[in-house]
């Protein structure tokens, strides 16, 4: 399910994520009000718009995706990437600095913490390895909605203090033991932690002047 789920998440992140929401009258632009946290908060807001709608039956009714299993796959991947996989990009002991990485950990860590009482996301240990398992996708969707509401409020009202607290408390610091485990597990894959795109150089081939 992950292939289509990834594409839908990217589509909704860019189109209805960044394009949605309004700033209240008299409030400055985010780069003025939220300053150095504006980018991470905005990326998080756009991610949450996409995540919220990926578990909406309306997308199935419209024929955008065959079933909600695609939404579940997106939730699984987002939590795993946000809490673990992306740590493979950092050197042991480093904090998270990049905006997209900050927002992913912020969302995943916040949802994990807020859902602990109902075991929405469970931290498991099997054969010496750590796993994060989503136990209730609908409750996780509610949590995503709550955080989206707060991020929109922060942007709309230019609440620097609240925005800073979210990023600093959830998006910057890394669990050292977990980071060490991720680096050890990822090393065995012999894969680069980043993927890039190489744009083709197109050279027209002429034949009979065409």
Regions found by a protein language model. Give the residues of each.
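Accessory "access/gating" subregions that flank catalytic or transport cores
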Residues: 1-3
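Active-site recognition of the HExxH zinc-binding catalytic motif
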Residues: 5-22, 46, 51
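Conserved helix-loop functional segments at active or binding sites
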Residues: 17-25, 55-60
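Post-HEXXH active-site segment of zinc metalloproteases
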Residues: 21-44
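Long, well-structured alpha-helical subdomains associated
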Residues: 38, 51-154
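Non-catalytic terminal regions of proteins
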Residues: 123-210
